[in-house]
C-alpha cells in the first residue's frame, strides 16, 4: 500500500491546475485516489505547458517534413541537414511567466533551458537569439522588466559563451501584465551523431548529471499554464535560479560523454524537472522507470518526494547509460566537477515507480502520463475578416521628412543597440553579420558555409487577421534570410496567446496556425520544433496574438553574404515588388495618424509572389550582382531606405514615380518587397532580368551624400535621422535610472 497522509480535496486539485473531469480521468486510470506525489506528477504532465492539450490537434496540421529534415517536432529540438555530414539543431521556447515575476532570473533560465535543449542532442551551441515583448513604455513596471530581462539574457549567454546575434523587441500595452521572453538557440553537430531521448534496454542505469536539486522552480510548469491575477508577485519562489558556469561545465561533460559512446538516451530536466524527463524517456522507449530519490543529489535538507519530482532546478540532465561504461562516465563528470549519481533503472513493466526512504511514493502507468493526457478540441470563433483601408482616407502629413524622423524614434522603430550591446555577439569568432540587419550570419567551421538566423512576427497583423498574420510572420522570416543571400531551410515556432478556453482567443490561435501552415507549405519551409505558451493573460486581459517564428537559412559560401548597408556613392537603388500603399495596420496609421483602435486589414500576403520575388533576389545576390539588400516591412519603403543609409553612412536621393498618395507610397507596408543596390552601370541589366522573370522592378534613385532627399524636396540629414533612431531607448532607460 502506498502511504498517503494528505487528503486530496477539490481545493488541492484546483491548486494543481486540474479540472474536476481531469481528476476523474486520473481516478479511472489508476483505480484509486492518488498520493500527493502522484497528484503532483499528473499535474505536471497534464498541464498545458507539457501536454499541449489545447493545441495538439492544430499543431498536427503543420508541415514538418522535408528533404533536409532529420528530426522534426517531438524531440528536444529540430535537426536539419546542412550537407557535408553536418546538421543544425535549433528550437525556440518561451519563459514568459517567470520573466514577468522575476525578470533577471526568468530570462536567464530561459536562455539556459533552450541551450540545454540543443546540446542534449549532441550539438555545440553556436548562436542565440531572442524575441522580447514588453508593456507600454509609460507603464510603471516596463523599465524594470526591460532592464532585468536584457541583463539576464546577456549575463547568461555571455558567461556560457554563446554569441547572441539577433532578435526582436516590441512595446505594447497588451504586454503590461505579461511580458514575452522567447529564447532561440542553435547548435552544430555531426549528422550521424544525434542523441535522442528514447530509452532502450531493460535494467539499464538511469543517471542524474549536473547541479544539485533544490526547491526552486517547483510548479514552474504549472504556473506557465495559468493566467496571472493580482497576486502574481507571490509566485516568485516558482522561478528557477540559473548558473551559466555550471551549464558550461555540463555542456563540455555531456559532449565528452557522448563522444565516449556511453550514452544510450539523454533528456534535459526542463519543465516539470525530473518527472517530465524520466517519463518522456521511458514512455518513448516503451519501458518503465524506477527511481530511488534517496540517491538524488540535493542542495537542501528534508526535501520530500513531491518537491524532488517537481523541482525545476537548473543545469541538470537525465541519462540512460551503457553499464559497461559506467566508470568511464563517472570519471568524466568528476573531472568537470559535476554531480553524477545512478538514481534508478529502466524496467519492463511500463510503470513509473518512485521510492523515498524505502517507501513507494508513486506507482503509475508510465504511458498514461503522456498518452492519456487530456486532448481538447476547444470551441473557437473565426474572427471577422477585416476590410482593406483606402490609403486616400488616411491624412497626409505636412512634411514627410519630419514624419520619417519621428517614426525612426518611435519605441517600436528605434535602434535596439542599447539591448544588443549588452550581448556578446562576437564570442566564438564566427559572427559574419551581427545584430541590426535583416538576418544574422555565422561562419560554419570546417568549410566555407554560413548559417543565417532571424526571428519575426507582427502581432498587430495577427490581431487584425490571424491567418494573414501567421502567413506574414513566416514570409518575413523567409525574406530576411533571402536578403542576406541564404536559402531558407526550416522554422521553429513559439506560439504565444491568451486563454484558450475563450473561443475568440482560440480562434486567433487556429487562424495563425492555418496561416503558418499555408506559408510553410508554399515556401517549402517545414516546422521542425516549437513551443506553445497559452494563458498569457492578467486579470482576464490577454496579449496580442504573438506566434513568433524563428528561421534558419544556409549560405554555400558565407563570403557571398550581403548586408543592408549602402556600400558606395553613386550606386543605383532598385525596388523589387509591387507597391499598393497598404496603410492598414501600419506603424504610420497607428503611431503617426493615431488610429490605435484600427480595425482595418493588414497587407495581404501573396505566397506565390513572395517565392518568385525572393528566389530572384537570392539568385542575384549569389551571382554577386548586388551590393546591399533590405526587405521592406515595418514603416515601409522610406524607413527601409533610412536604415540602409544609416548602416552605410551614405545618403540617397529618390524620386518615386507613383500615382499613390506620397505618404502611402512612403510608409505603406506591402509585402514581398526588397530594396537592392548595385553599381550604376549594372542597373539596366538588373531591371531587365527582373522584368523577364515577371517581377516588378523600379529604379528609385541613387546613393550619395550625407542626406536623404525625396522628390528633390528638403533634404533630411543622416545625422538627424541617426540621432532620433539611436536616442530613444538609451534615454528611456536612463530616465528610469534617475527615478
UniProtKB/Swiss-Prot annotation:
Query: What cystine pairs are annotated?
Result: none
Could you state a single Gene Ontology molecular function term?
A: magnesium ion binding
User: Which keywords fit this entry according to its UniProt record?
Assistant: ATP-binding, Cytoplasm, Ligase, Magnesium, Metal-binding, Nucleotide-binding, Purine biosynthesis
Q: List positions binding Mg(2+) 1.
A: 93, 531
Give me the residues that bind ATP, please. 52, 91, 493, 530
Kindly list the GO CC terms recorded for this protein: cytoplasm
Detail which positions bind substrate: 94-97, 116, 240, 312-314, 533
Query: What does the record list as GO biological process?
Result: 'de novo' IMP biosynthetic process
Q: Which residues form the active site?
A: 49, 95
Catalytic reaction annotation:
N(2)-formyl-N(1)-(5-phospho-beta-D-ribosyl)glycinamide + L-glutamine + ATP + H2O = 2-formamido-N(1)-(5-O-phospho-beta-D-ribosyl)acetamidine + L-glutamate + ADP + phosphate + H(+)
EC number(s) reported in the record: 6.3.5.3
Which residues are listed for Mg(2+) 2 binding in this entry? 117, 268
Any Pfam family: AIRS_C
> Sorted alphabetically, which InterPro entries does this protein's record hold?
PRibForGlyAmidine_synth_PurL (IPR010074), PurL_linker (IPR041609), PurM-like_C_dom (IPR010918), PurM-like_C_sf (IPR036676), PurM-like_N (IPR016188), PurM-like_N_sf (IPR036921)
The protein's annotated pathway: Purine metabolism; IMP biosynthesis via de novo pathway; 5-amino-1-(5-phospho-D-ribosyl)imidazole from N(2)-formyl-N(1)-(5-phospho-D-ribosyl)glycinamide: step 1/2
Q: Where in the cell is it found?
A: Cytoplasm
The task this protein performs is described as:
Part of the phosphoribosylformylglycinamidine synthase complex involved in the purines biosynthetic pathway. Catalyzes the ATP-dependent conversion of formylglycinamide ribonucleotide (FGAR) and glutamine to yield formylglycinamidine ribonucleotide (FGAM) and glutamate. The FGAM synthase complex is composed of three subunits. PurQ produces an ammonia molecule by converting glutamine to glutamate. PurL transfers the ammonia molecule to FGAR to form FGAM in an ATP-dependent manner.
Subunit: Monomer. Part of the FGAM synthase complex composed of 1 PurL, 1 PurQ and 2 PurS subunits.
Family statement? Belongs to the FGAMS family.
How is this protein named in the record? Phosphoribosylformylglycinamidine synthase subunit PurL
Amino acid at each position: 500500500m502506498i502511504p498517503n497522509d494528505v487528503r486530496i480535496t477539490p481545493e488541492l486539485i484546483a491548486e494543481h491546475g486540474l479540472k474536476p473531469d481531469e481528476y476523474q480521468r486520473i481516478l479511472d486510470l489508476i483505480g484509486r485516489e492518488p498520493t500527493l506525489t502522484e497528484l503532483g506528477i499528473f499535474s505536471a504532465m497534464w498541464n498545458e505547458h507539457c501536454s499541449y492539450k489545447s493545441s495538439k490537434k492544430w499543431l498536427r496540421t503543420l508541415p514538418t517534413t522535408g528533404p533536409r529534415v532529420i528530426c522534426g517536432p517531438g524531440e528536444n529540438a529540430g535537426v536539419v541537414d546542412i550537407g557535408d555530414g553536418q546538421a543544425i539543431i535549433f528550437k525556440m521556447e518561451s519563459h514568459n511567466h517567470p520573466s514577468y515575476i522575476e525578470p533577471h532570473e526568468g530570462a536567464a533560465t530561459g536562455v539556459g533551458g533552450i541551450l540545454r535543449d540543443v546540446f542534449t542532442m549532441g550539438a555545440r551551441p553556436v548562436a542565440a537569439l531572442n524575441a522580447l515583448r514588453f508593456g507600454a513604455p509609460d507603464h510603471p513596471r516596463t523599465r524594470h522588466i526591460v532592464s532585468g530581462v536584457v541583463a539576464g539574457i546577456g549575463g547568461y549567454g555571455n558567461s556560457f559563451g554563446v554569441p547572441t546575434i539577433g532578435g526582436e523587441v516590441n512595446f505594447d500595452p497588451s504586454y503590461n501584465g505579461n511580458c514575452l521572453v522567447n529564447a532561440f538557440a542553435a547548435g552544430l553537430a555531426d549528422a550521424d551523431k544525434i542523441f535522442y531521448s528514447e530509452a532502450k534496454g531493460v535494467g539499464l542505469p538511469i543517471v542524474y548529471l549536473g547541479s544539485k536539486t533544490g526547491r526552486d522552480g517547483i510548479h514552474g510548469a504549472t504556473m506557465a499554464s495559468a493566467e496571472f491575477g493580482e497576486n502574481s508577485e507571490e509566485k516568485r519562489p516558482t522561478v528557477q535560479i540559473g548558473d551559466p558556469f555550471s551549464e558550461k561545465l555540463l555542456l563540455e561533460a555531456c559532449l565528452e560523454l557522448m563522444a565516449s559512446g556511453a550514452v544510450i538516451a539523454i533528456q534535459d530536466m526542463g519543465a516539470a524537472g525530473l518527472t517530465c524527463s524520466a517519463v518522456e524517456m521511458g514512455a518513448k522507449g516503451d519501458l518503465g522507470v524506477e527511481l530511488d530519490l534517496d540517491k538524488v543529489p540535493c542542495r537542501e535538507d528534508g526535501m520530500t518526494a513531491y518537491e524532488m519530482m517537481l523541482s525545476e532546478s537548473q543545469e541538470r540532465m537525465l541519462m540512460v547509460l551503457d553499464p559497461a561504461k559506467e566508470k568511464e562516465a563517472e570519471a568524466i563528470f568528476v573531472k568537470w566537477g559535476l554531480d553524477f549519481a545512478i538514481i534508478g533503472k529502466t524496467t519492463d513493466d511500463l510503470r513509473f515507480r518512485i521510492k523515498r526512504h524505502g517507501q513507494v511514493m508513486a506507482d503509475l502507468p508510465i504511458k498514461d502520463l503522456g498518452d492519456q493526457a487530456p486532448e481538447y478540441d476547444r470551441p473557437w470563433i473565426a474572427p471577422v475578416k477585416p476590410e482593406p483601408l483606402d490609403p486616400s482616407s488616411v491624412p497626409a502629413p505636412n512634411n514627410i521628412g519630419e514624419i520619417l524622423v519621428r517614426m525612426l524614434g518611435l519605441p517600436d522603430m528605434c535602434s535596439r543597440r542599447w539591448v544588443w550591446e549588452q550581448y556578446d555577439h562576437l564570442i566564438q569568432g564566427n559572427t559574419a553579420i551581427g545584430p541590426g540587419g535583416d538576418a544574422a550570419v555565422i561562419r560554419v567551421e570546417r568549410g566555407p558555409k554560413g548559417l543565417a538566423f532571424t526571428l519575426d512576427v507582427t502581432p498587430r497583423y495577427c490581431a487584425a487577421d490571424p491567418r494573414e498574420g501567421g502567413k506574414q510572420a513566416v514570409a518575413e522570416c523567409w525574406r530576411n534570410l533571402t536578403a542576406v543571400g541564404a536559402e531558407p531551410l526550416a522554422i521553429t515556432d513559439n506560439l504565444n496567446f491568451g486563454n484558450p478556453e475563450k473561443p475568440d482567443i482560440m480562434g486567433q490561435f487556429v487562424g495563425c496556425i492555418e496561416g503558418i501552415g499555408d506559408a510553410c507549405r508554399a515556401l517549402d519551409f517545414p516546422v521542425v520544433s516549437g513551443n506553445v505558451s497559452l494563458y498569457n493573460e492578467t486579470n482576464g486581459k490577454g496579449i496580442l496574438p504573438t506566434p513568433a517564428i524563428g528561421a534558419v537559412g544556409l549560405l554555400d559560401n558565407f563570403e557571398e553574404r550581403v548586408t543592408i548597408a549602402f556600400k558606395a556613392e553613386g550606386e543605383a537603388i532598385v525596388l523589387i515588388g509591387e507597391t499598393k500603399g497598404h496603410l492598414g495596420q501600419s506603424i504610420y496609421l497607428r503611431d503617426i495618424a493615431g488610429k490605435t483602435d484600427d480595425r482595418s486589414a493588414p497587407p495581404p500576403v501573396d505566397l506565390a509572389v513572395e517565392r518568385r520575388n525572393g528566389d530572384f533576389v537570392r539568385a542575384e545576390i549569389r551571382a554577386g550582382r548586388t551590393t546591399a539588400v533590405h526587405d521592406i516591412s515595418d514603416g515601409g519603403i522610406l524607413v527601409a531606405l533610412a536604415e540602409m543609409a544609416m548602416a552605410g553612412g551614405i545618403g540617397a536621393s529618390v524620386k518615386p514615380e507613383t500615382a499613390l498618395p506620397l505618404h502611402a507610397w512612403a510608409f505603406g507596408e506591402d509585402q514581398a518587397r526588397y530594396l537592392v543596390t548595385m553599381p550604376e552601370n549594372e542597373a539596366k541589366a538588373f531591371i531587365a532580368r527582373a522584368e523577364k522573370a515577371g517581377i516588378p522592378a523600379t529604379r528609385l534613385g541613387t546613393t550619395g551624400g550625407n542626406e536623404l532627399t525625396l522628390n528633390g524636396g528638403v533634404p533630411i540629414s543622416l545625422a538627424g535621422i541617426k540621432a532620433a533612431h539611436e536616442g530613444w531607448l538609451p534615454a528611456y532607460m536612463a530616465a528610469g535610472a534617475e527615478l
